[in-house]
Amino acid sequence: MKKYFSLLFFATTLALPAAAQQDPKAGKILDQMSAKYQALKAFQATFTQTLENPSAKVKQNISGDILVSGQKFRLKISGQEVINDGKTTWTYLKNENEVNISDSDPDAQEMSPSQIYTMYKKGYKYNYVQQVTEGGEALDVIELAPENRQNDVFKVRLKVREKDASVKSWQMFKKNGNQYTFLIKNFKPNPPTDAGTFTFDKAKYKGVKVVDLR
């Protein structure tokens, strides 16, 4: 089975112990940001992911679309469609016309893109860095560091809009030199969803091969 998109294991790599002393200014901004997103029934956004490794002279960009409702989501990116209803995950591989079915792992939390809005509450030290202006927008820059030093990720940098506490981007720094930047675009709050939004409908994928890994 093909590996999951890095956005999906983002929360997994940062599942850590309880947090210590924190920066109150950063904490206030993060709380406002978290409350904003948790108040939504659902949200949809397009995004761009950039993978950079300066030492290896690597820079790659891919774009995608995601729809999230609580712990449920539907992600389309780079020939893959990943659907999660909170219990089951379907990963559809377009080129192979194949869908892999697996159980969601509530402990790993790897299938919860919404974790970006709550992850700071446990296992991180966070610090207010500065305010910057990009494209005429004032952005508060906050850095989070995992307390578990064995973690592959050593830093996460969030950029939060001052005007409405929405997230513009986040950047993940890994020990192997890889840097992942996620830039949120075309954010839509509370899009319509129904019972079938977060399930895989085999009838819509003619001739699909089903691989049940449960």
What are these regions (language model features)?
Residues 40-42, 61-63, 70, 84, ...:
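Extracytoplasmic
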Residues 16-58, 71-72, 204, 209-214:
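N-terminal leader/targeting segments and the immediate start of mature chains
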Residues 124-131, 135-206, 211-214:
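Gly/Pro-enriched, hydrophobic low-complexity segments
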Residues 104-138:
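Flexible, surface-exposed loop/linker segments and immediately adjacent secondary-structure boundaries
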Residues 47, 73-77, 89-92, 101, ...:
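Short hydrophobic/aromatic-rich beta-strand segments that constitute the beta-sheet cores
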Residues 4-13:
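Sec-dependent N-terminal signal peptides
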Residues 63-111, 180-181:
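An acidic-aromatic
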